[in-house]
A protein has these predicted regions:
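Secretory targeting and sorting signals
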Residues: 1-29
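Short, surface-exposed binding/anchoring microloops in extracellular/periplasmic proteins
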Residues: 36-79
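Beta-strand-rich interaction surfaces with strong enrichment in secreted/lumenal proteins
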Residues: 45, 88-93, 108
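Short proline/glycine- and polar residue-rich coil/turn motifs
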Residues: 51, 90-100
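Short aromatic-acidic-glycine turn motif
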Residues: 77-87
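Short glycine/proline/serine/threonine-rich loop/turn segments at secondary-structure transition edges
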Residues: 109-119
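Enriched for extracellular/lumenal, surface-exposed ectodomains of secreted and cell-surface proteins
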Residues: 121-131
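Short beta-strand elements
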Residues: 129-149
Length: 149
């Protein structure tokens, strides 16, 4: 085994650690800081499972402005499963006012049952500024109760 590459790697790692340790964190001056626009998405505490298996999730959202189309997307999972089921998307209006969203989707039959579930809602923009990459305005994860009906 050659010692020179190992010494070079160790010296480089030490240099990075020492440089990072002396860097001061950036802080904003409260007098000149511009507040971020108020953007949020919420999830209602109850979701519905229809007799045909369609899941309906809902909540509210608020966003200030956008340069491209904005959507509220949602997904649901249940139990210890790592599988998340998408429940569609709603086109959002970014005018600073609070709006309702309702998404419906039909996951694999029998995959969701009445009871506790975890829902994640995302307020996401698709714009020319990012190519194909989305810009996330807000994300909310919440435990909900799925009911029949």
């Amino acid at each position: 085994m050659r010692l020179r590459p190992l010494l070079g790697a160790a010296a480089g790692a030490a240099l990075l650690l020492l440089t990072g340790a002396t860097a001061a964190p950036a802080t904003a001056d409260p007098a000149t800081a511009v507040p971020a626009p108020y953007e949020a998405v919420t999830v209602d505490r109850v979701g519905r499972i229809a007799t045909d298996g369609t899941v309906t999730l809902s909540g509210t959202y608020r966003c200030q402005s956008s340069s491209g189309p904005v959507f509220v997307s949602s997904s649901v999972s249940q139990g210890v499963s790592t599988i998340r089921y998408g429940t569609g998307g709603t086109r959002a209006v970014c005018d600073g006012a609070e709006h309702r969203w309702v998404n419906k989707g039909r996951p694999v039959p029998g995959s969701l049952v009445p009871g506790a579930a975890h829902v994640e809602a995302t307020l996401m923009e698709l714009g020319a500024f990012s190519g194909l990459l989305p810009r996330f305005h807000a994300v909310q994860g919440q435990t909900v109760t799925l009911t029949r009906g």
